[in-house]
Amino acid sequence: MFGLRKSPANLPKHNSVDLKSSKPNPFDSDDESDNKHTLNPSKRTTSEPSLADMTNPFGGERVQKGDSSSSKQSLFSNSKYQYKNNFRDSGGIENQSVQELEGYAVYKAEETTKSVQGCLKVAEDIRSDATRTLVMLHDQGEQITRTHHKAVEIDHDLSRGEKLLGSLGGMFSKTWKPKKTRPINGPVVTRDDSPTRRVNHLEKREKLGLNSAPRGQSRTREPLPESADAYQRVEMEKAKQDDGLSDLSDILGELKNMAVDMGSEIEKQNKGLDHLHDDVDELNFRVQQSNQRGRRLLGK
Amino acid sequence: MGQESFIYSFVARGTMILAEYTEFTGNFPSIAAQCLQKLPSSSNSKFTYNCDHHTFNFLVEDGYAYCVVAKDSLSKQISIAFLERVKADFKKRYGGGKASTAIAKSLNKEFGPVMKEHMNYIVDHAEEIEKLIKVKAQVSEVKSIMLENIDKAIDRGENLTVLTDKTENLRSQAQEYKKQGTQVRRKLWYQNMKIKLVVLGILLLLVLIIWISVCHGFNCTD
């Protein structure tokens, strides 16, 4: 699918394969006698492996000059180097044979598959981080709620303290009434508990180890035989890329839901914090009043 | 292959068309040129106009405008993907300065076939491009939501900082309250003790007075 990133526009016309020729599929051609497909060796640079020396570097066939695996390896790595270099050292893409371009297409397809798999891995890492973040946010939300409950408890204790301070004035002193600007209500209970449920669900998944399993590898594809031609291999890579992209799309969907949940959780916490601010302000004011009353009692 | 989704395309510098390509005849070049005149050249952005079941898509960047006229059955994203490809190719070929000095329609012969190739490529790979566009859109959606979340988290952080200051203040006030409570308790305990001792003293004094009055002195043998 994404094997070749550049459009046919980037390949000059003289290099295109004539589809009206006797061969039905230009990729099947191993016959290099046709001048349409090949260039004279004189035009090649020394760094390029000569096609006369080998039948197909990608089809797993033997190199004719020698059976040594080292020479085969060096040829293959040389090709890889050229692909990475976009054939700059060997006259550019225009001056390559069909066979080399087939190899290049396979190489590019594999590279693209690798990058899609890389994206998928990154997305999975982000998902696991997002899960942890969501769990952490939920815990922090609960901490804020607990803090708010504590503020309510402080309010109750303070009310008792104020009563006692009021009764300590003595017989002839005027009674002390603490000022209350507003009642302390405690945490606002929201009906929507979906993030909580979601977090519990995610925690369960995490404990079961379901989130860490990469989904990209779930689809098993039969490996192609060694004799498979470049076209089949590119098609297989395209299929892998399609699978990777659909997995990536699924993960991104999950990430979106998680991001929305994070947003709603943070928003809920912000609202809770606003209420807590007001309650803490009220407590501060009342403790200050009680302190003034205490000082007055001590001063008598 | 005879693609019929893309009708007409051009690349312009300002309002001067440098290269154009079409396989059809019609009034779309003049409509596109009119649209080009109205484009705000200063901003780098994308514009789409609809006219008679056709979309006129523009991509403006660095003083150059890239346009494609397509049938409205073709999605906007595909048209934009085409314009992005044309832009990249145009910059690659003429970025060195040739484009800035080129006269009207002087690049037709060179760049026209290139635009044709891009049209064919985009139409041939529309499904694949749409898949990629969908994933890109999902990524940007998640990114925008997360950017909002970051803003919210920053607000939350500020809220927590303010709350920390307030609770710190409350803690110091509460410590003061506790200290004063202890002092008040101690003071009241002393007061209480003092009262008890005074009452006890008075009682003892009363007992003593009664004793003296009954016994006419301290000798009470009778």
UniProtKB/Swiss-Prot annotation, chain A:
Cysteine-cysteine disulfides: none
Positions with biased composition (Polar residues): 38-49
Biased composition (Basic and acidic residues): 190-208
Disordered: annotated span: 1-76, 176-228
Subcellular location, record wording: Membrane
Residues bearing the modification Phosphoserine: S29
Biological role: t-SNARE involved in diverse vesicle trafficking and membrane fusion processes, including cell plate formation. May function in the secretory pathway.
Protein name, per record: SNAP25 homologous protein SNAP33
Lineage of producing organism: Eukaryota, Viridiplantae, Streptophyta, Embryophyta, Tracheophyta
From Swiss-Prot, chain B:
UniProt superkingdom: Eukaryota
Domain v-SNARE coiled-coil homology, first and last residues per copy: 131-191
Residues covered by the Longin domain: 10-115
CDD domains: Longin, R-SNARE
Residues in compartment: Vesicular: 219-222
Residue numbers on the Cytoplasmic membrane side: 1-197
Predominant cellular place of this UniProt entry's protein: membrane
Annotated transmembrane regions: 198-218
An example Gene Ontology biological process: protein transport
InterPro entries named among the record's database cross-references: Longin-like_dom_sf, Longin_dom, Synaptobrevin-like, Synaptobrevin-like_transport, V_SNARE_CC
Pfam families for this protein: Longin, Synaptobrevin
GO cellular component term, pick one: plasma membrane
Membrane topology (UniProt): Single-pass type IV membrane protein
Subcellular location as annotated: Cell membrane; Early endosome membrane
Tissue: Expressed in flowers, leaves, stems and roots.
Keywords associated with the record: Cell membrane, Coiled coil, Endosome, Membrane, Protein transport, Transmembrane, Transmembrane helix, Transport
Family from the record: Belongs to the synaptobrevin family.
Function: Involved in the targeting and/or fusion of transport vesicles to their target membrane.
Protein known as: Vesicle-associated membrane protein 724
Species whose genome carries this gene: Arabidopsis thaliana
Gene: VAMP724
